[in-house]
């Protein structure tokens, strides 16, 4: 069932299968940390990261431990960031980082221009870049048809990563 806005009509069509192929890289996941609202520097999501030149000469904190975090952190370093501190939540990426880069355990809070990590590390920072993934967002589906899962490489209840186990005629592509 859908609305034809041009003709202001409600229409209903029947299909054997429905494929949801909208992907999930449009609504960034923005975690909340104490002190974020009062942080005097820049906070952005990797979704909006365009040019590492902006961070030349600055202390940058990158939060995340997957491909985007690695890419953003290395770009910031390459383009002259004063320091790059990567905060991970579960496991460090574990690379031998160049001088001026390090990994530390989980951001606890921001206090002024300082990032305080759970392992006790304190880092002055000018910018925080969130490489924290994306939310699944399906505003066009009714609640009973929406895939409800956190940001995961292999969402549960998707057989072979595509066929929804709650309704085998609903196929999700690009959710990983």
Question: Can you name each region flagged by the protein language model?
Answer:
Residues 1-176:
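Flavin (primarily FAD) cofactor-binding/catalytic cores of flavoenzymes
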């Amino acid at each position: 069932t859908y609305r034809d806005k041009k003709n202001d009509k409600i229409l209903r069509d029947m299909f054997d299968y429905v494929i949801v192929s909208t992907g999930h890289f449009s609504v960034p996941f923005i975690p909340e940390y104490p002190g974020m609202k009062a942080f005097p520097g820049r906070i952005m999501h990797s979704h909006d990261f365009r040019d590492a030149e902006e961070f030349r000469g600055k202390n940058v904190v990158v939060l995340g431990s997957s491909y985007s975090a690695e890419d953003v952190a290395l770009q910031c370093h390459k383009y002259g960031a004063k320091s790059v501190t990567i905060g991970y939540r579960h496991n460090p990426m574990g690379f031998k980082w160049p001088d001026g880069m390090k990994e530390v355990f989980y951001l606890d809070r921001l206090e002024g221009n300082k990032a305080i990590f759970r392992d006790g590390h304190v880092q002055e920072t000018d910018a925080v870049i969130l490489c924290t993934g994306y939310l699944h967002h399906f505003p066009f589906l009714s609640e009973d048809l929406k895939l409800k899962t956190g940001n995961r490489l292999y969402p549960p209840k998707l057989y072979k990563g595509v066929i929804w186990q709650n309704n085998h005629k609903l196929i999700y592509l690009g959710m990983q």
